[in-house]
A protein has these predicted regions:
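Active-site Tyr-X1-5-Lys
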Residues: 1-20, 48-49
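Aromatic/hydrophobic pocket-lining residues that form π-stacking "cages" and hydrophobic walls in ligand
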Residues: 4, 8, 43, 101
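Flexible, glycine-rich beta-alpha linker
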Residues: 17-38
């Protein structure tokens, strides 16, 4: 990722190419792939299958999640700007993975347990964007609260048949865009 940013900056500096660099953080929403290895699709998939939720590590690591419509709005504003340095687009509201697992259980109305497994090597303890530039330069902040976005996301996946749920991609998203 850093190499790509360096190449982009070089094209801007040496060739005058109009560029934008966006750093996105944990985007989620309807139509995401349930098998992509990230925590939201993993928890939703496990909940829908009636499986216990798997937390890697002790669950104290934190993440922040940005609903897809907020992410798109931030990227759009960056594209309309003339700012060529990196800008973080994400929601800085953090939650521990353990607390998030409990939120998913509450959201789904199920009785699954949370099970803990060894933390993968190099898994960050915190992933929270500093969105100061997005606020100052783009006038952007995330608007959709995690609870609201997760409800929309869960309801989308809950509405799918088992066959649709098993698909790699989900094409119909018209009713989930604000």
């Amino acid at each position: 990722k850093r190499f790509q940013e360096s190449i982009t900056m070089a094209y801007h500096t040496f060739h005058g190419v109009e560029t934008r660099i966006v750093r996105i953080f944990n985007t989620y929403g309807p139509r995401m792939r349930l098998n992509d290895g990230r925590v939201i699709p993993a928890f939703i998939g496990q909940a829908l299958r009636g499986e216990d939720l798997t937390v890697f590590g002790d669950g104290s690591q934190t993440r922040s999640f940005c609903y897809v419509t907020d992410q798109v709005e931030g990227i759009y504003r960056l594209l309309l700007s003339d700012y060529h340095l990196p800008v973080n687009i994400g929601n800085p509201d953090e939650i521990t993975i353990s607390d998030f697992a409990e939120e998913i259980i509450k959201l789904t109305g199920t009785t699954q347990k949370v099970i803990y497994k060894d933390l993968p090597v190099n898994d960050p303890m915190q992933r929270q964007p500093d969105i100061t530039k997005a606020k100052e330069i783009l006038g952007w902040t995330a608007k959709v609260k995690r609870e609201e976005g997760m409800k929309i996301t869960y309801e989308y996946f809950k509405s799918l048949s088992p066959e649709e749920l098993a698909k790699e991609e989900h094409k119909d998203f018209s009713k989930y865009i604000y």
